[in-house]
Amino acid sequence: MSDLDRLASRAAIQDLYSDQLIGVDKRQEGRLASIWWDDAEWTIEGIGTYKGPEGALDLANNVLWPMYHETIHYGTNLRLEFVSADKVNGIGDVLCLGNLVEGNQSILIAAVYTNEYERRDGVWKLSKLNGCMNYFTPLAGIHFAPPGALLQKS
């Protein structure tokens, strides 16, 4: 694997990592579905395992999006290990802030994502994502509001 191929692969994989988070936060079905191989698995500890692009959309449409008014995910500390020229293992930390539908409660989630990425026919996509939550913490008395929301109530 050439240095150029390794750098291009790393950039493509970093985009996949971000696209998963952006797809969930912005509720962009096309973006979210486009990052998975048909035989991929997305597992969220305590929720379940979903397969392929259709499974990712099922998880988003029937579990995540009905659970939250909105979310924002911050993905950090992405570390990639090239197993071969066409397979990469990744680990990264994710911080999610959001407002739950139930109780209109704000929440903080800290998780570790362990991912597997594969290149097939020159294209990188996710083959496995495992989300392990370290914290799922309601923020008592707090509701995240957009900028200016408090000013509008005055």
Curated annotation (Swiss-Prot):
Positions of the catalytic residues: D25, H73 (proton acceptor)
State if Lyase is listed as a keyword: yes
Coiled-coil positions are none
> Keyword Lyase: yes or no?
yes
One biological process term in Gene Ontology: response to toxic substance
One annotated GO molecular function: lyase activity
| Principal subcellular localization | periplasm
Catalyzes what? gamma-hexachlorocyclohexane = (3R,4S,5S,6R)-pentachlorocyclohexene + chloride + H(+); (3R,4S,5S,6R)-pentachlorocyclohexene = (3R,6R)-1,3,4,6-tetrachlorocyclohexa-1,4-diene + chloride + H(+)
| Keyword annotations from UniProtKB, A to Z | Detoxification, Lyase, Periplasm, Plasmid
Please state where this protein is localized: Periplasm
Role description: Catalyzes the conversion of the important environmental pollutant gamma-hexachlorocyclohexane (gamma-HCH or lindane) to 1,3,4,6-tetrachloro-1,4-cyclohexadiene (1,4-TCDN) via gamma-pentachlorocyclohexene (gamma-PCCH). Proceeds by two successive 1,2-anti conformationally dependent dehydrochlorinations. Also shows activity with alpha- and delta-HCH, giving alpha- and delta-PCCH respectively, but not with the beta isomer.
An additional note in the Swiss-Prot or TrEMBL entry is: Is not N-terminally processed during export, so it may be secreted into the periplasmic space via a hitherto unknown mechanism. Gamma-hexachlorocyclohexane (lindane) is an organochlorine insecticide which has been used worldwide since the 1940s. Because of its toxicity and long persistence in soil, most countries have prohibited the use of gamma-HCH. However, many contaminated sites still remain throughout the world.
Q: Which family does it belong to?
A: Belongs to the HCH dehydrochlorinase family.
**Name under which the protein is recorded:** Hexachlorocyclohexane dehydrochlorinase 1
- Organism equals Sphingobium indicum (strain DSM 16412 / CCM 7286 / MTCC 6364 / B90A)
Protein's gene: linA1
